[in-house]
């Protein structure tokens, strides 16, 4: 775009909001628990305390000779005993949202005991169990020390010992609990103990729902396997398939893969040796199924050898489909581990959560004001569509609010570069779709902003899981229209505690006229704004909670103003399910046109 078109948007003078009320009761309770724990420790009755690290990685290996791995009879047995300024907030009244819950409300799914098998004891104290108690191989122990981990998280302390003992595990743990290390350590130890070599082919396969999560797991595996001789690699859509195939033929002992690309290689890559597979890990199983890979997973399970294979399945939620996948992938009677079943909240304890109610035409100005105030923080902003991310990133960068953007329509190299740039940045703003909402371990995120609300409380939980990880604190803010307040009832059922945040109107930068002038004069931004506006309506029309998110009740004049239009443009939107097509896209694009069933919207603002 030409620089002469540039029109700067001026903001109000320096502003701030009142500091949040502190919860003294929680602080006193924590002090009391620390004193009690110290007393128990003195008496020798306390096993452990809350670990300070979240993402730990570990490996277990078994001996292997020539081309055929020996049987794994000598498995090591382990016992499993069992400053930034924030808006003022207020607790909303219980009767403030008058919404009748109906059959569309997501209900907690249960799993069959026949599938789950034995349960590890949830009442056992697993705090501060050191990794040194696991008797891991020297290379793995050294790698864990280099990574800065000393003690295990609860999911690691409850999962790693039975996995080292060769058991199958079905694990349920909230995001940020350290489960990546929980399955990587036994996997690496397994390959090491079996002395896998490239000629033996693949011994461990780890399946991940998204490319970004696959890259992250691969990065952790790389650190963990630094002192080992085994080979490792990643397979994912968007990467060079021929280069992947060449490496597979040479022999890759540990593979991290997305479902579609893995199935492709299993079916079509000659020379890919996976007959010696000894461990299968399915991470974020619920998400894999949600985005439409149920049939691919069934085919993968059918193609992989099951004899003498250890399997691990991790899922944040236990749905019927997850249970069915566990039934076909795990051996009978797996150990079921749920580290969250005794917790009162579904989100992290150190997470401060709030929501703000504002009309559509105030949304961008409030977001702009918030981001300007938090430029020195690390912030992730979630949108419902790729085009909306693209438009807001172009606009904010144009008006001197530097941001990064990440969504499913970007080429893989762009996504990868953006992902690692944000991870390594001490501060910054990332605009994204739900492609970044699951499993990714992004350090030191201060704020999660859900500019477009999710359609399901589970998606809300996964989004806010990008902050307050590994015992650290974090904050989240959910934007809601007045008509969307009923969503709070669903969050309450899902055990998500929120306070209402109030932003003083005089503190919000009134840049509407400048925004409309810029969009009307800059052709490039105008086109991008039109695409973002259309995609926002498409995504809204695809929401399943129609009584709360009803596209026909939107004030389009106000929605148009949020995208910089004095008069909302005429656009065609698909009122079919965006998710239906999205589910087939391994990119996890949140902005697909769906089927060509069209509705026409123009100038339908409320009087």
UniProtKB/Swiss-Prot annotation:
Record motif Bipartite nuclear localization signal, residues:
362-378
EC number(s) recorded for this UniProt protein: 3.6.4.13
Cite the InterPro entries for this sequence. DDX18/Has1_DEADc, DEAD/DEAH_box_helicase_dom, Helicase_ATP-bd, Helicase_C-like, P-loop_NTPase, RNA-helicase_DEAD-box_CS, RNA_helicase_DEAD_Q_motif, SPB4-like_CTE
Identify the keywords attached in UniProt to this record, alphabetized. Answer: ATP-binding, Helicase, Hydrolase, Nucleotide-binding, Nucleus, Ribosome biogenesis, RNA-binding, rRNA processing
Q: Where is the composition biased (Polar residues)?
A: 94-113
Subcellular location as annotated: Nucleus, Nucleolus
Q: Please tell me whether the keyword Nucleus is annotated for this protein.
A: yes
- Name the residues that bind ATP: 173-180
One cellular component (GO) term of this entry = nucleolus
What domain of life is recorded for the organism? Answer: Eukaryota
Give any single GO term for biological process.
Answer: rRNA processing
Map motif DEAD box onto the chain.
Answer: 283-286
Stretch list, region Disordered: 52-121, 576-607
Q: Which reaction does it catalyse?
A: ATP + H2O = ADP + phosphate + H(+)
Comment block on domains: The Q motif is unique to and characteristic of the DEAD box family of RNA helicases and controls ATP binding and hydrolysis.
This protein's assembly is summarised as: Associates in the nucleolus with the 60S and pre-60S ribosomal subunits.
Function of this protein? Answer: ATP-dependent RNA helicase involved in 40S ribosomal subunit biogenesis. Required for the processing and cleavage of 35S pre-rRNA at sites A0, A1, and A2, leading to mature 18S rRNA.
Put simply, this protein is called: ATP-dependent RNA helicase HAS1
Q: Top-down, what is the taxonomic lineage of the species of origin?
A: Eukaryota, Fungi, Dikarya, Basidiomycota, Agaricomycotina
